[in-house]
């Protein structure tokens, strides 16, 4: 059994995990040592802090996804600021741009991406970045504000990955890297040094091959990790050890 499996991006706070109280203990007993449970709305922000308060290996990222920011208020920022004082809140996220769905409008997305980047700087917290069909726009704001953090679920080019790395960011890979058509993600993973690499599920989404199409959970990181270990030319346990260390250093966690 593999140890030190750290899932740097999951959504166990969601309705898809009504069985979380049975599932999470099984995961912790099977090698999963830590999980960053990530919010996407104010509602899920509240749920994730409740979840991390109940489970020692679970930590929270709080913030509002670009598809949800159209309803954000000044009071929501006050709430985020207050919740960020909790000891198990370790990041602001997920925040960023989503030009694929574009549910909030691009100007509104930019406004709240910037406001949440400023909030993270004020709180001295790393950020978890969502970027879909907005690589250059995301890079431009990261270059402007220079946060610590991770661009999660990366599937962009190796060239853009190198530019993001120059800003001091980490890059996270999901089960997408196992897909047969994921040539860009594979090339990008090859370009990311081990000390900047994070591994994640984005569960319940993004189940890797050979489990694609079912609800994802952190146990499936053995498949994603196996592919990343193959790409990087390292032993799978060594990859888990290194990505655990990376996550703990980035998010200020002592395990």
Protein language model annotation of sequence segments:
Residues 1-255:
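Mid-domain alpha/beta scaffold segments of enzyme catalytic cores
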